[in-house]
Amino acid sequence: ARTDNFVRL
């Protein structure tokens, strides 16, 4: 998901 990419940071 898009949020997943951000949370990975």
From Swiss-Prot:
The modification Leucine amide is found at residue 9. The keyword Cell inner membrane does not apply. It is found in: Secreted. Its main location: secreted. GO terms for biological process: neuropeptide signaling pathway. Keywords: Amidation, Neuropeptide, Secreted. GO terms for cellular component: extracellular region. Belongs to the FARP (FMRF amide related peptide) family. FMRFamides and FMRFamide-like peptides are neuropeptides. This is Extended FMRFamide-8. It comes from Namaquaphasma ookiepense (Gladiator bug).
